[in-house]
Amino acid sequence: MVHIGPIHRKEYDLEADRSEAVVIAEAPGRVHYLGEHGEPKAGLFLSSAINRRVQLAVSARKDNSLRFYAADSEERKRTSLANLKYKREDRWANYIKVAIYLFVELGCPVKGLNFSLWGNIPQHVSLASSQAIEIAAAVALRELFKVPLDDRTLVSALLAAQKGFFGKSNPPIDYLIALYALENCFVLADETTMEVTPIASILSDYTILLTDSRVPRAGVEEELRERRRAIRKGLEILGSKKQRASLREAAVADLTDLAGILPENIRRRNTHIIQELRRVRDAQEALAGTDPQALAKTILHSHENLRDLYEVSCPEVDWLVKRAQEIDGVLGSRMTGQGFGGCTYTIIRESAVEEYTRRLDDYERIFGFHPVIYRVRLGSGARLLRE
């Protein structure tokens, strides 16, 4: 793996002066295995960090300039503290800038800064690459400025900074997973309590393959907004007719009772969420009980619901999942992330990987997209690195 420290010193001519402190942090990407489409602020996720990560190095400057270098693409961006604002053309650098904004808002004596970034998290496939940059930058700057913020307070401050910098904030779960994940563990992440509970993996005999379908994802945001509206409307009706404050309190039978009131699309969307909440708990029990076959059934049923009820899959992704499930040695396969393309994950024995890879030749012939496979492991959370 690349180490960003020497690259940073070379980029900013710091190789001769070792007295100039360079702080380095890394943060992981993540995979949601179950639960990523849920009730806003009340979701329940089975997730993990992965060993695909970003590394970020930062050092102080003597002026008020802000310099950014992406080592993997050799891109450079620059701005100043006086001009610290979102710029669309700055793309990846905006995720570092929001962390700078965080510490400016906290009243830290921020001066000019040099940043270098390297990462191997696949982008635009719902693996939290941008959140990893934000967390790595926030952790590095916390250390550089010696600010006594615990991880939860850091996440709260980062969400507030996002609102000020971007005009909106992300859900906190991805940041909590990035900070609290443990090696070789899944995590149960609960949005209502902000608790992230590690669950030891029982899959030492398996590897995890992420397959990028390469399907273009135009128009995804409006489709997702429609589903969020359906969840809100379902909650409104369940609240008034069944006194349910949350989908966690609801049952599929409640939706059946309201069949004459609920439009069909709202019934389907909310049915998926209610059943998915149960599936996350079932998966937790399967992992605790060392029952991989029960986990496999849960994964299969989840994808079927995402396809048929929540309707965020697509033919290409369904093909990948179906073909994977046909292979002896595959425990489970499912779409992950926002949907309408993106990635699948496949939990597979090493002996079956060659057969899986061979079947992807048919995918390209049928759909015209060249899929990309990433082999990943359950990874640890964000941390500081020695230079």
Residue ranges and their predicted role:
Residues V2-L34, Q55-N94, P109, C185-G332, ...:
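C-terminal nucleotide
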Residues M1-V31, H37-L44, E89-L203, A352-V353, ...:
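Gly/Ser-rich oxyanion-binding loop with an adjacent helix/lid
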Residues F340:
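Glycine-rich phosphate-binding loop
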Residues F115-L117, T211-S213, T344:
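A structural signal for short, well-ordered beta-strand segments
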Residues Q131-A132, C343-I347:
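FabD-like malonyl-/acyl-CoA
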Residues S126, E143-K146, P216, Y345, ...:
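Amphipathic alpha-helical interaction elements
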Residues A42-A49, R227-R228:
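Short Gly/aromatic-enriched secondary-structure transition segments
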